[in-house]
């Protein structure tokens, strides 16, 4: 590499290119075409005997079933000294059941060609699943097992805590994350739960115990 060996040029001089010829005048705005039609699917509603409300859309193009189960809760049920508890709980629900280790649970889900994810928000904790229609009952059985018979393994709990703290430290180095967290505090106030990071903070997450999750 020889410094200064490059050719000199004037950046103010713009190159000229021959324009591609057109069969019409591009300076004239074309007429609008027909308004596109949008077919909005019908949403059906139902209620179970236990009071659960169901909202659904039918689509027979592919043999798949996708469903979300929302449970009232999430960040708004936390206390200020336990920020991030809902997120830790949701993450730990994916880490095995009373009858299955993490690996066994993952294998059971994969054998069905399904995916099951649990995440928490401000007002709800949501279990989201996608599966083949023929495996719907088996997938739903796994969801039930994850919710009602969680493993709550201490080693997995420690790993989830460490991963969450690592994410929080990454956010501290991200201008977008810092801006988002600061914006929420300014909008809702420092004493309002909605102004807090859904993951909590490094101090609060470190103080959460497995008994808090249970």
Q: What is the meaning of each model-derived region?
A:
Residues 117-119, 152-159:
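Surface-exposed patches in mature extracellular/periplasmic domains of secreted proteins
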Residues 16, 30-34, 162-177:
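Short N-terminal helix-initiation segments at or just after the protein's N-terminus
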Residues 99, 154, 207-210:
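Alpha-helix N-capping/helix-start residues
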Residues 1-4, 55-57, 61-149, 165-169, ...:
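M16 family metallopeptidases and their MPP-like homologs
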Residues 28-45, 185-214:
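Histidine-acidic residue clusters that define the catalytic metal-binding segment
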Residues 1-72:
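Proteolytic maturation boundary segments
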Residues 51, 105, 139, 157-160, ...:
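Hydrophobic/aromatic residues in well-formed alpha-helices
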Residues 12-15, 131, 208:
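Hydrophobic pocket-lining residues within nucleotide cofactor-binding pockets
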